[in-house]
Amino acid sequence: MDKLFKTSFRFIIRFLQILSLPVVFPYFLLSFLACLITSKNYESLPYNYPPEIRFKKVYRLVSMWLYIKGIKVVTVNDKIIPKKPVLVVANHKSNLDPLVLIKAFGRLKNSPPLTFVAKIELKDTVLFKLMKLIDCVFIDRKNIRQIANALETQQQLIRQGTAIAVFAEGTRILSNDIGEFKPGALKVAYNAFVPILPVSIVGSLGKMESNKRLKEHGVKKSSNYEVKVIFNKLINPISFNQIDSNNLANNIRSIISDAYTSEKPSND
């Protein structure tokens, strides 16, 4: 009976959301255009656009997109997020994951602004301008010098008060397994001496993926409308500074995997 009630309630909510789309969608398009214009102006006049303005624009745009898609972001243990910058390390199941993290961080008072480390290939996408608006750091894995420069950029952003998120698996894992974590993704935490916040994202598997790609991997898209963001216990730098990065990566992977497994929806 409880499940039936939840299903019925969800149906009503989604129905009302769909009815509101003729109003919401044009506003979303206008907001998207405004973000693109702001991003272009930010490149030429960066000091005219402080982080609180730029990040807020992107947060609002992401919130509207999630509303349009009918996706609800649920956070667990969000009170442990500190006001100071952290390195967020999360699992990666879908292109939806960065948007979910933006939503989870952006709606919390006093949380630091959040940006991402992303692959250089994303520069060829329409999202590049939006990513630049929140100071995303792009990495070319084939260029050692560029990787070093990107690491310095990450440290600079942290000094300026921005939290950085990395998907340490390095790619989307289209299964319920958690992939191996790359220790290089944690280097900025060592260099900048900042806490690490392990985050488990549950319920995004297969979302924003083509049916062809899902079929190739034998994956069924999650039918759950909720995506859960679990903030695991903060790891302070004094506790990992002397630990080998490979061991630290394995420890963080275990933390994220345990929380993911315990919260994974049955239909994922």
From Swiss-Prot:
Superkingdom of origin organism: Bacteria
Chain segments annotated as transmembrane: none
Cross-referenced Pfam families: Acyltransferase
Pathway membership, UniProt: Phospholipid metabolism; CDP-diacylglycerol biosynthesis; CDP-diacylglycerol from sn-glycerol 3-phosphate: step 2/3
EC number assigned by the record: 2.3.1.51
SUPFAM superfamilies noted in UniProt: Glycerol-3-phosphate (1)-acyltransferase (SSF69593)
Motif (HXXXXD motif): 92-97
Keywords annotated in UniProt: Acyltransferase, Lipid biosynthesis, Lipid metabolism, Phospholipid biosynthesis, Phospholipid metabolism, Transferase
Keyword set includes Hydrolase: no
InterPro entries xref list: AGP_acyltrans, Plipid/glycerol_acylTrfase
GO cellular component: membrane
GO biological process, one term: phosphatidic acid biosynthetic process
Entry's Gene Ontology molecular function annotations: 1-acylglycerol-3-phosphate O-acyltransferase activity
Known catalytic reactions: a 1-acyl-sn-glycero-3-phosphate + an acyl-CoA = a 1,2-diacyl-sn-glycero-3-phosphate + CoA
UniProt cross-references to NCBIfam families, sorted A to Z: AGP_acyltrn
Protein family according to the UniProt entry: Belongs to the 1-acyl-sn-glycerol-3-phosphate acyltransferase family.
Comment, domains: The HXXXXD motif is essential for acyltransferase activity and may constitute the binding site for the phosphate moiety of the glycerol-3-phosphate.
Protein role: Converts lysophosphatidic acid (LPA) into phosphatidic acid by incorporating acyl moiety at the 2 position.
Protein name (Swiss-Prot/TrEMBL): Probable 1-acyl-sn-glycerol-3-phosphate acyltransferase
Source organism: Mycoplasma genitalium (strain ATCC 33530 / DSM 19775 / NCTC 10195 / G37)
